[in-house]
């Protein structure tokens, strides 16, 4: 069992039960999944760009990414329906906890001028979205092999009903929110 999963079961769950006065242990919110998405607009002109992005995403998450395709054709972007334009990974279970642990304790502190992440990125239903500007903050990415810096979106889906519960859950897990 991963370190964060143990922490969740032994420390966070009782703390949340006390704070929000849940009647059942099943009411305590938990992280359901983490979706890491990389939109690669350059893939329209050059399909090799997509391959390197997929490799990087696989190195970061430890899971093979799914290539996302365009839903609509957009003439101004020279984009046709069905063209590959991105990659995404949905993490659940052990891999999810390992990725979250690495994100909070290793990657986010490596961001330049890091003062904590925004409190305002909750969606109203207890999910948190985080944008990362460059993939170099992850320890698996070799600086010399990177052809282009790419950003990614990280969505943390929780079972929390409100943003307040979700914020408390992520804070307990060690997410560095701005004060």
Curated annotation (Swiss-Prot):
**Keyword set, alphabetical order:** Ribonucleoprotein, Ribosomal protein, RNA-binding, rRNA-binding, tRNA-binding
Which Pfam families does this chain map to?
Ribosomal_L5, Ribosomal_L5_C
Q: How does it assemble?
A: Part of the 50S ribosomal subunit; part of the 5S rRNA/L5/L18/L25 subcomplex. Contacts the 5S rRNA and the P site tRNA. Forms a bridge to the 30S subunit in the 70S ribosome.
- Kindly give the PANTHER family that the UniProt entry links to this protein: 60S RIBOSOMAL PROTEIN L11-RELATED
Keyword tRNA-binding applies: yes
Q: What is this protein called?
A: Large ribosomal subunit protein uL5
| Family as reported in the entry's similarity comment | Belongs to the universal ribosomal protein uL5 family.
Q: What are the recorded Gene Ontology BP terms?
A: translation
Its cellular-component GO annotations read:
ribonucleoprotein complex; ribosome
Entry's InterPro entries? Answer: Ribosomal_uL5 (IPR002132), Ribosomal_uL5_bac-type (IPR020930), Ribosomal_uL5_C (IPR031309), Ribosomal_uL5_CS (IPR020929), Ribosomal_uL5_dom_sf (IPR022803), Ribosomal_uL5_N (IPR031310)
**Any one GO MF annotation of this record:** structural constituent of ribosome
Q: Which NCBIfam families match?
A: PRK00010.1
What span is annotated as the signal peptide, if there is one?
Answer: none
Described purpose of this protein according to its UniProt entry: This is one of the proteins that bind and probably mediate the attachment of the 5S RNA into the large ribosomal subunit, where it forms part of the central protuberance. In the 70S ribosome it contacts protein S13 of the 30S subunit (bridge B1b), connecting the 2 subunits; this bridge is implicated in subunit movement. Contacts the P site tRNA; the 5S rRNA and some of its associated proteins might help stabilize positioning of ribosome-bound tRNAs.
Q: Which domain of life is it from?
A: Bacteria
| HAMAP family on file | Ribosomal_uL5_B (MF_01333_B)
């Amino acid at each position: 069992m991963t370190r964060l999963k143990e922490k969740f079961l032994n420390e966070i769950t009782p703390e949340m039960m006390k704070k929000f006065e849940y009647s059942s242990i099943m009411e305590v919110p938990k992280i359901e999944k983490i979706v890491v998405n990389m939109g690669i607009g350059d893939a329209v002109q050059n399909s090799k760009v997509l391959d390197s992005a997929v490799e990087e995403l696989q190195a970061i998450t430890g899971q093979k990414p799914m290539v996302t395709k365009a839903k609509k054709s957009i003439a101004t972007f020279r984009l046709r329906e069905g063209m590959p334009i991105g990659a995404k990974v949905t993490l659940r279970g052990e891999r999810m906890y390992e990725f979250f642990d690495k994100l909070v304790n290793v990657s986010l502190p490596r961001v330049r001028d890091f003062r904590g992440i925004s409190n305002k990125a909750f969606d109203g239903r207890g999910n948190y979205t985080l944008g990362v500007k460059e993939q170099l903050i992850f320890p698996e990415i070799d600086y010399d092999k990177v052809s282009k810096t790419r950003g990614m979106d990280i969505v943390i889906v929780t079972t929390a009903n409100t943003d307040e519960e979700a914020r408390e859950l992520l804070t307990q897990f060690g997410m560095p929110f701005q004060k």
